[in-house]
Amino acid sequence: MKKTFNLFIIALSLMVAFSTTAFAVEWPQEDFNNDAFNSYFGQNVSGRISTSLVFSDPAEVKAMKDGKILIVMADVSDDSEFFPSTLGNSVIVCHDDDLISVYANLDGESVQENVENKKSLKEGEIIAETGNSGWQETRSNLEFQIIDLQKSAAINPKILLPRAENEIEFTMTGIMLQNKDGKLFDIRENKVYPSGLYKVFQTRNKIAAPYKTTVTINGVVVDEIAFDTVGQENGKLYLIGKKKYESKDLYPDENLLLLGEMMLTPGRSTLGLTVQNYLGKIKQQSYVISIY
């Protein structure tokens, strides 16, 4: 039977039932290195900030840790921002540390075989095989989400799960400055700017997203955007920098990623840009610019 659930509201209603404890989690699939994903948490997916990790290959799906089965769903569409697309056959598990984990785009028959009559799961216990039941119609890819009930936010699985041995190489290319009127300037070709508020963009990687981006002026941090959690306010998802950045701010089109905002004042300044991945590896660039 098909039903529609506002999963985030359901999750929030369970907050009082669980206490906060230390936790350790395991990956829901065996392969979690750099080629194991189609899309990172925080990426631009159909004009939204993704709250999921999307895996690239079919595989067995396992429970990330001990928990109680909250919902088993078949071809369910949810209209909340945290779950904006068809989840397909999905299993949602509630854990004793104010987290819920969501395993979506599963094979319906294997869901029935593995969890239909169960009330709880042990860490590493098989939930199902991946399927083609969700929005990813062409591949059997797991869509995996973690929601923190205390923070009312989606948590990047990469900051909770065991660290991978390698990550997709994240490069800094195509640096652009955008003024308040929306005009873009290629920083390689423009070294002189009128004073004012500017956004700094780079060319977007279509799969990977950084862990953190930092913008400095003369060595002073003026903005820093973290890709560790996605919050929700007034029906809109956002990442936190010096302010709350929505999808339209972070990804104004399919090709750009926001690194941060800055106020340029008259004089000669050094603009510093840093991106950091989940292994702590950083890429840095600096530019000397003149402002009038």
Describe the residue ranges of each PLM region.
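Short histidine-centered loop motifs in beta-beta connectors
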Residues: 56-58, 62-63, 95-124
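Exoplasmic/lumenal beta-rich domain surfaces
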Residues: 84, 100, 108, 216-263
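A structural signal for beta-strand boundary/capping segments at domain termini and interdomain linkers
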Residues: 100, 280-284
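Bacterial N-terminal signal peptides that target proteins for export
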Residues: 1-9
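A glycine-anchored, Pro-Gly-centered beta-turn/N-cap motif
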Residues: 196, 260, 265-269
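Surface-exposed, glycine-biased beta-strand/turn segments
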Residues: 20-89, 94, 122-123, 132, ...
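Bacterial N-terminal signal peptides
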Residues: 9-19
